[in-house]
Amino acid sequence: MIKRCEYDTFWPILSSADSTPKTAAILADSNENRNNTMNISVFCGASLPHSEQITEAARQLGRAIARGGHTLLYGGSNLGLMGATSGAALQEGGRVVGVIPTFFSDDIIHSQPVSELVRVRTLAERKEYLIAHSDAFVALPGGIGTLDEVLEVMVANQLGLVRDRSGANQSQGKPMILLNLGGYYNPFLEQLRLVKEEGLMRSDAGLISAYSVEDIFLKLNPIVKD
């Protein structure tokens, strides 16, 4: 099995630090920099995983985004990990923007009113909206829909198609963070390593691996301060 440190070595942007500060410390740091608040898109599914650890991490992420003064953007459903993440953010008084295609029925939309609900026609339009209106992206452990969203961001970063919220070109791309709980994304990272080794991928495309909710903000805070 490939260990965590090997991925941290391969992806230059990844941190190899083993120690993670406590959530309170990171949130305090976030609160001191409210002028640097972000729109953070969370990619996750409308299903609940078998692992309660993943579901609890989704709730922690929603709370952390709200407490940091950031805005949560997500796929608009009240089901599964989408509901866990957005519900936790709403309970903390956070701003939550749901982006949902019109072909989904109304009964999957959040029962607690979100701050803003954006209706789009297709899944492609949802991804386009999230990429255009977000400063950073976090993927919880997820299925093929989540992987599709991750790869969409990576392709946009690699091709230089990403723009900031003002519409200006953002040549350095936007951070795409994988929450790699328990090594969930290790096989995916290994495949990307092979792709890059074969010369079929030019860069890390903004990909960052984090190992806890605390680690996400440890890695995002220096980026937003810049």
Question: What positions do the PLM features span?
Answer:
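A cross-family phosphate/adenosyl-ligand binding-site feature
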Residues: 36-133, 168-173, 178-225
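Active-site/ligand-binding-proximal alpha/beta "capping" segment
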Residues: 125-162
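Intrinsic-disorder-associated, low-complexity terminal segments enriched in Asp/Asn/His/Tyr and depleted
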Residues: 8, 18, 29, 33-36
